[in-house]
UniProtKB/Swiss-Prot annotation:
Superkingdom of the organism of origin: Bacteria
GO CC list: plasma membrane
InterPro entries recorded: Glycosyl_transferase_4 (IPR000715), PNAcMuramoyl-5peptid_Trfase (IPR003524), PNAcMuramoyl-5peptid_Trfase_CS (IPR018480)
Catalytic activity: UDP-N-acetyl-alpha-D-muramoyl-L-alanyl-gamma-D-glutamyl-meso-2,6-diaminopimeloyl-D-alanyl-D-alanine + di-trans,octa-cis-undecaprenyl phosphate = di-trans,octa-cis-undecaprenyl diphospho-N-acetyl-alpha-D-muramoyl-L-alanyl-D-glutamyl-meso-2,6-diaminopimeloyl-D-alanyl-D-alanine + UMP
Record keywords, A-Z: Cell cycle, Cell division, Cell inner membrane, Cell membrane, Cell shape, Cell wall biogenesis/degradation, Magnesium, Membrane, Metal-binding, Peptidoglycan synthesis, Transferase, Transmembrane, Transmembrane helix
Protein name in the entry: Phospho-N-acetylmuramoyl-pentapeptide-transferase
Pathway assigned in UniProt: Cell wall biogenesis; peptidoglycan biosynthesis
Gene Ontology biological process: cell division; cell wall organization; peptidoglycan biosynthetic process; regulation of cell shape
EC id: 2.7.8.13
Co-factor requirement: Mg(2+)
The organism's taxonomic lineage, starting at the top: Bacteria, Pseudomonadati, Pseudomonadota, Gammaproteobacteria, Cardiobacteriales
Organism, scientific name: Dichelobacter nodosus (strain VCS1703A)
Molecular function in Gene Ontology: metal ion binding; phospho-N-acetylmuramoyl-pentapeptide-transferase activity; UDP-N-acetylmuramoyl-L-alanyl-D-glutamyl-meso-2,6-diaminopimelyl-D-alanyl-D-alanine:undecaprenyl-phosphate transferase activity
Annotated membrane topology: Multi-pass membrane protein
Length: 360
């Protein structure tokens, strides 16, 4: 809205042109989401406390987590609100990518919100039935995959790009649809599994969104894309604003989620953020680079798959407890050490992911 207003009034007051540049809108998108998240966070926490929407803690997990019982959750709604307002202010509302991003964010967020609501308000400790939850997530992911497939104007928009290789590409055709479906559902659940310690999931989300913001900015420029041998995607610049808003809202949420956390994001935040990052990666054709940058999320998800598979096949567990962060906790690592080391790993992985821009 503010972008459209600045565009319309720039002919009368030329300094407003500065607000129409993509770089300006990226910065303003991040700042808007950050400030909204910080200033609205306190009120949301008090509301959640008043409504007694406190976290349920399993008694078979690390004993240090028992003190977290009752901490307000569903704080992810604050993140979604901040991102949405920021996008409506600074993104180009004529761009289909703006609405695609919001559709995924709100769609996955709605499933997570329903799950959290049933757990916390209706006191149904299991929330949505597993099949129900999977069906709803699958529906949103499949609609997104179909949207992107039929939106594609050029073959490159449905081509899988291999990092570190300049000419290794695979035109997926109709297989693009199930591929996108798997990327979205996989990423959303991976972030959800990572969200088990104070600040553990949100900082990697911020860091990965920063990396994807750079990819989106460069892919949206035909000149940069040609120089770097990456796909040129018209309109991808709006996804850079989306990434900036995610990073800003995430940092604002971390203000309250840092140890000891005053609020947790819940499924409403984790599912939506994972899918949002995956959507950006799909649009800019950097799914494999996204897997590298989000290596912490991948490791957390794989640890659960390995643990379950090993127990079912051999009757033995590979890890002390899954997801992976609990394995280290039960090994004697303090919560803050696990969290910060996972942050450091993510910084390194994001840099490795960005290095694919030149190392080909």
């Amino acid at each position: 809205m503010l972008y459209a207003l600045a565009t319309g009034l720039s002919a009368i007051f030329t300094p407003l042109n500065a607000l129409t540049y993509l770089t300006s809108r990226i910065i303003l998108g991040a700042l808007t989401a950050l400030l909204l998240s910080i200033f609205c966070g306190g009120k949301m926490i008090r509301y959640l406390q008043k409504m007694q929407m406190g976290q349920f803690v399993r008694d078979d997990g690390p004993k240090t987590h028992l003190k977290k019982a009752g901490t307000p959750t569903m704080g992810g709604a604050l993140i979604i609100f901040s991102i949405t307002v920021s996008m409506l202010c600074w993104a180009d509302l004529r761009s289909v990518y703006t609405w695609l991003a919001l559709f995924v964010l709100l769609g996955f967020g709605a499933v997570g919100w329903t799950d959290d609501y049933l757990k916390l308000v209706k006191k149904n400790t299991k929330g949505l039935a597993a099949k129900q939850k999977y069906a709803y997530l699958s529906l949103v992911a499949l609609l997104t995959a179909l949207w992107l497939y039929f939106l594609a104007d050029t073959p490159i928009e449905t081509t899988l790009i291999m990092p570190f290789f300049k000419h290794f590409e695979w035109q997926m055709g109709i297989l693009f649809i199930p591929f996108v479906y798997l990327v979205l559902t996989g990423a959303s659940n991976a972030v959800n599994l990572t969200d088990g310690l104070d600040g553990l999931a949100i900082m990697p989300v911020v860091l990965v969104s920063g990396g994807l913001c750079i990819f989106a900015y460069l892919s949206g420029s035909a000149n940069f894309a040609l120089y770097l041998h990456i796909p040129a995607i018209a309109g991808a610049g709006e996804m850079a604003i989306f990434c900036a808003a995610i990073a800003g809202a995430g940092l604002g949420f971390l203000w309250y989620n840092a140890h000891p956390a005053l609020v947790f994001m819940g499924d409403v935040g984790a599912l939506s953020l994972g899918a949002a990052l995956a959507t950006v990666a799909v649009v800019v054709r950097q799914e494999l680079a996204f897997a590298v940058m989000g290596g912490v999320f991948v490791a957390e998800a794989l640890s659960v798959m390995i643990q379950v598979g090993s127990y079912k096949c051999r009757g033995k567990r590979v890890f002390r407890m899954a997801p992976l962060h609990h394995h280290f906790e039960l090994g004697g690592w303090p919560e803050s050490r696990v969290t910060i080391r996972f942050w450091i790993i993510t910084v390194v992985l994001v840099l490795v992911g960005l290095s694919t821009l030149k190392l080909r």
